[in-house]
């Protein structure tokens, strides 16, 4: 992804539109399965030797971190697809306004790459806001709303899991 240029992103966006409902199911299912597995794993901590506890905790933290990153990576691809999808005239749909583009003509505007979409995705996921990138399309606005809600629920579950784990270890 890091080495892909804009033409690569356009080609992928035109050729592969993973259905939204399937993407949603994969992301939510994967994140939920990860949290359930971590809860199951951490429920076995009592009575384990210290080195085994550390291993279980490490695996649990790693699984949650990877599931959290997966959510935002999938939304990175959705934002890229939505941006480089074409309208009836064959132009990019766009929908995100980058700070570098303010006051510039269309031909001088930034052609975002995956890192730009990843930046947007992770900012939405971590802060539930868009920071310095504006949204100018209804489709991306709805995607960002869904992303924010999923991220809020996932982040809340992580906080609850952390508090429960710490509470269980202190008893």
Language-model features, listed with the residues they occupy:
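Membrane-helix interfacial "entry" motifs
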Residues: 13-20, 52-56, 109, 140-144, ...
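Membrane-proximal soluble regions of multi-pass membrane proteins
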Residues: 83-85, 89-134
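Alpha-helical transmembrane segments of integral membrane proteins
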Residues: 21-28, 54, 58-60, 117-120, ...
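Pore domain of cation channels
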Residues: 116, 120-123, 131, 135-170
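Membrane-water interface of transmembrane alpha-helices
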Residues: 1-6, 73-87
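Juxtamembrane helix-capping/reentrant segments at transmembrane boundaries
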Residues: 9-29
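Residues within alpha-helical transmembrane segments of multi-pass membrane proteins, especially transporters
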Residues: 32, 36, 65-69, 74, ...
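Long, highly hydrophobic alpha-helical transmembrane signal-anchor segments
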Residues: 23-79
């Amino acid at each position: 992804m890091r080495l892909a240029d804009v033409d690569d992103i356009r080609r992928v966006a035109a050729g592969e539109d993973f259905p939204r409902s399937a993407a949603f199911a994969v992301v939510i299912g994967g994140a939920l399965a990860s949290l359930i597995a971590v809860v199951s794993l951490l429920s076995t901590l009592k009575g384990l030797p210290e080195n085994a506890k550390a291993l279980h905790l490490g695996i649990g933290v790693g699984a949650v971190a990877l599931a959290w990153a997966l959510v935002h990576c999938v939304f990175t691809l959705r934002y890229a697809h939505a941006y480089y999808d074409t309208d009836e005239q064959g132009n990019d749909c766009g929908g995100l306004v980058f700070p570098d583009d303010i006051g510039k003509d269309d031909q001088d505007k930034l052609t975002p790459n995956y890192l730009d979409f990843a930046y947007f995705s992770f900012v939405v996921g971590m802060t539930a806001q868009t920071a310095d990138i504006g949204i100018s399309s209804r489709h991306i606005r709805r995607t960002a709303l869904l992303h924010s809600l999923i991220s809020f629920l996932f982040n809340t579950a992580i906080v609850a899991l952390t508090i429960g784990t710490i509470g269980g270890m202190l008893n």
